[in-house]
Amino acid sequence: MRLAVLFLPVLLGAQAPSVPYDPNDPDGLVVSPNGRYRHAWKRQGVWIEGRLSNPFGRPLAGIPAATAGEIQQMNATLSALAAILKATPEGSQRIGYFMKESRLFSYVHPPDLPSGFAAARLPLRFSCGFFPFYNTDTLRNGVWVADRGGETESVYFEFNLLPGKLRSNVIAKEERGPNLNPIEFYPRPDLSVTYRGFPVADGQDLILTRGGRDPWIAVPYGRALKAALPEYEKDRDTAERRLADLKKAEAETLSPAYEQQMRDHLEKTSGSLRTQNPAKWQGRVASMERELAYNREKASREANPQRDQNGNWYWHPIDAYADASRRLASMTAEEASRPACFEEVPGEQGRYAMRGHVRAAGSGGGTCRELVMDNYGYFDPKLGRAAAQILVVRSLGRCAKVVEGRLVGPSMPAKMQLPPQGCYRHVPIWEQMDWERVRALLAP
């Protein structure tokens, strides 16, 4: 039910588009051309509260199932959140649309956890998705019946789920053996954009945290470089395989058999010229020999890459792997404990798996981004599993951009054919809602 919406930024309060309904009709009804549907542009829609459920399956061994009290506590938090949205003018009036909720909860996945964390003590994850649908009636057996489905743009408010890498690329993975998922290392998401004082990570997901807590934790340089070494190795191996193919092609091109093959081909296609037109025959022979010399020179040049623009495809990954191996082998314990960062080098040829350098923080200049991983130490197990400790709004950026502290949403077409729904409804609700009340839903 999530449908992407393309938008052009316009400020809220822009000139209203023309509408297709009779302004004197109290419901603003517009019947579709086939007569099977009608849209109620002015009718106040309902707010359908979701029932908290877990569609993701039972918890794995060692994790207790959610108790009735925990389910009640999670549901109370989601109801309090919904009340904040419903308290806005847009959320309370709901002219032309209805709101449908989806309330879900799930358990932490033990194979994802770093060592030292007990899955049974980590909080339950729960969320509420909001789906604004325009009011539509369907004609069934001569009776108009209100529809309660369709497609729209949903946005989820997710509690107790760490934001993770968001839109950052995973730089390296720390393998941990069978039955455990690797730990992912990635650049810290960009938190420079804020809305109402809260960061909008990578311009997409709004994040509310408990004061002083960071949902990411720095990756030690030693761990990061060790995990990244297989990626450097992949690029080195790719370069070596390509070089081996070029060496093979060089040997074939320099062989007497290759020359004989070219002479045989010339004889087959132009041999009659030897007696019919000797001068032309000599010209063909000279041309073939020039081609042979060119092919051999080219094959030798490609099979012996130099440290220049033409040979960077080989030397860049070879040198990068050698440098990373040397740094890892000579690293002191003090160096290994320093935070790591990643310096991207998008222009380097031959770098496909590892498109940059893992370095110690402070050694890569201003372009070296801090490497982080999920911080499960963010959660306080003393608060109880159903306590709200972090909130991520996924994804505010699908519907709006932050411009000078305000949300800029999708522009409305000059002539609306259907009542506005989805992002057209989310954005004004967000602009009108009390985000400090939302923050207060988190444990102090």
PLM features per residue range, with description:
Residues 28:
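Aromatic-rich peripheral "rim/lid" segments of glycoside hydrolase catalytic domains that contact
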Residues 2-13:
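Bacterial N-terminal signal peptides
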Residues 407-444:
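Surface-exposed amphipathic alpha-helical segments
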Residues 32, 38-389, 395-399:
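Short, solvent-exposed recognition patches
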